[in-house]
């Protein structure tokens, strides 16, 4: 019998690799609401958004320090984003329904989730923008994983380094008021379409990490 997690992950198998589950109007409505909230509460400063491609595929790859990161990222980018999130989030029927409506893609971590990678690749090939947090989590070893680089390599989509500043402090218990948040977009890293090789993905991930850490 399949485990609960396997069942939840199987829910992600939509027609055309999940592309039909993406509701752009729903996403944009949520973006306007949460974007206005974040900008008002945290006086969000956006730097370098003009560097982002207006159309076509791109892989957005920020650092990850807080559960607030996805909301801030969505608020700062005018285009619809397909977020990659841990499959555990779909354990809640309500949250899973919301995430599906927003076009998020769940990934079963630690097992090389081929379905999630395929759906992200198809989204890029359809000209969409996807967002992946290479660190994967806001706690633990926080190693920079190769998923974003691998997707960029197999699709030739530009890889965009992004630095989120202040999101960890924004939710800390000892904060005073609402600290100002800043998001900085770096120059997109142009990637030539190539075979998905571990060595190339590792080198590209190292380049991405250096680019993110250089943004201030």
PLM feature segments, named:
Residues 2-51, 92-102:
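A transmembrane-helix-recognition feature enriched in membrane-embedded lipid enzymes
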Residues 2-26, 115-216:
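Non-catalytic C-terminal accessory region of glycerolipid acyltransferases
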Residues 33-35, 101-106, 131-136:
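Short, basic, glycine/proline-bearing loop/turn elements
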Residues 39, 52-111:
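Catalytic core of membrane glycerolipid acyltransferases/transacylases, capturing the structured
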Residues 41-45, 109-117:
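Glycine-rich, highly charged phosphate/nucleotide-binding loops
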Residues 46, 60, 83-84, 104, ...:
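Generic preference for hydrophobic
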């Amino acid at each position: 019998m399949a485990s609960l997690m396997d069942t939840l992950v199987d829910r992600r198998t939509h027609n055309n690799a999940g592309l039909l589950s993406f509701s752009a109007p729903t996403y944009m409505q949520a973006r306007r609401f949460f974007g206005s909230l974040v900008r008002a509460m945290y006086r969000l400063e956006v730097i370098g958004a003009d560097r982002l491609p207006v159309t076509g595929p791109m892989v957005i790859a920020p650092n990850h320090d807080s559960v607030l990161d996805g909301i801030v990222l969505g608020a700062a980018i005018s285009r619809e984003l397909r977020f990659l999130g841990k499959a555990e989030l779909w354990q809640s029927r309500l949250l899973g329904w919301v995430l599906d409506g927003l076009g998020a893609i769940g990934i079963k971590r630690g097992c090389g989730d081929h379905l999630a990678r395929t759906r992200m690749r198809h989204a890029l090939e359809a000209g969409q923008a996807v967002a992946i947090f290479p660190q994967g989590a806001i706690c633990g070893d926080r190693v920079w994983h190769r998923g974003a680089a691998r997707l960029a390599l197999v699709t030739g989509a530009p890889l965009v380094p992004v630095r989120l500043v202040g999101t960890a402090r924004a939710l800390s218990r000892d904060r005073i008021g609402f600290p100002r948040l800043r998001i900085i977009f770096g120059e997109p890293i142009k990637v030539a379409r190539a075979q998905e090789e571990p060595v190339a993905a590792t080198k590209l991930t190292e380049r991405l990490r250096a680019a993110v850490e250089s943004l201030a």
